[in-house]
Amino acid sequence: LAGKRYVILTKQSNDSEYQLLILANSPDRFYYGDAVTEYGFDETGFSAQLMQGLTTLADFCTNMLTAPLAVPSVSVIPYSGNGQVIPMSYLLEVDKIDHTTKIENTDGTPLMLTRAIAKMVIVNKATNFELKGVVAVMNVPRQGPLHTLDGLIRDNTSNLTEYRNDAAYSSLLVQADFIDGGESTENDPVYLYESDMRNNTHLIIQGAYGGRDYFYKMAIVNKDVQLMDLQRNHSYQFTIVTAKGPGYDTVEDAKASKPSNTALDYEISVDNRDSYEVVANNDFFLGVSNSVFIAYTS
């Protein structure tokens, strides 16, 4: 097998379209419905879970999960290391499967895949504040499905972790870079699996105000200061507009503070366009080369 892209085929009735579940940038292992048992991302692993006549596409999409992150996830932000690529997926309907079948849109254009993660970036534009970086990301899902059939976010409230660089929060997880008019983490974004608002996923950042370093809690809230979901294939940018006062002296105090820290005024912009850049475009579009068909038939 090529080890990068797989297409799983299931036999359909005579009048039905074939549903091609395309998984690109695939991991080398997966978990099925839990965080305990791993399976190889190959025909043997799939065959262990795909029960002929029993397993539906919905079942497979619901249970096909990434490998779980550790608790806590120390110094590890998924898919941010050198050479790591982000899993992506697409569900394509075709009316037949043979040597003439093309993996493309009906107009001949390449398929635009859906990323399995969300992206978060912090930008500081406040003149009275200096963003140092991200210290921790709290209440982060440990796993995510490789593809969602219904578009709903998986209930992972009991399967959470946190990103941090060390146990004492003594160093930054993500360091901000200087940009024109402020600082930004664009060059080192935070990736995470889609997260329900009930998880209360939030960031702890470090910044300088009035000549001193403080910690601030940044919740994922909308314009009405209501918690919101973090969805796959979406980019979230926090823009700090102004600092109203000091934050907290310790990370623990910041973690225990109210969900929306009133010491910072910030805006959250959400980009759900398929074209926002997470990885290079050549990893984002699926062509017909380097693809493997694994056919399951009766």
Regions found by a protein language model. Name each.
Residues 47, 57, 66-69, 135, ...:
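Residue-level detector of intrinsically disordered, flexible termini
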Residues 1-46, 112, 119-232:
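Tryptophan-paired
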Residues 1-129, 209, 274, 278-282:
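Short, low-hydrophobicity acidic/polar segments
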Residues 219-298:
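Low-complexity, acidic Ser/Thr/Pro-rich "mucin-like" tracts of secreted and single-pass surface proteins
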Residues 13-16, 26, 47, 68, ...:
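Generic serine detector
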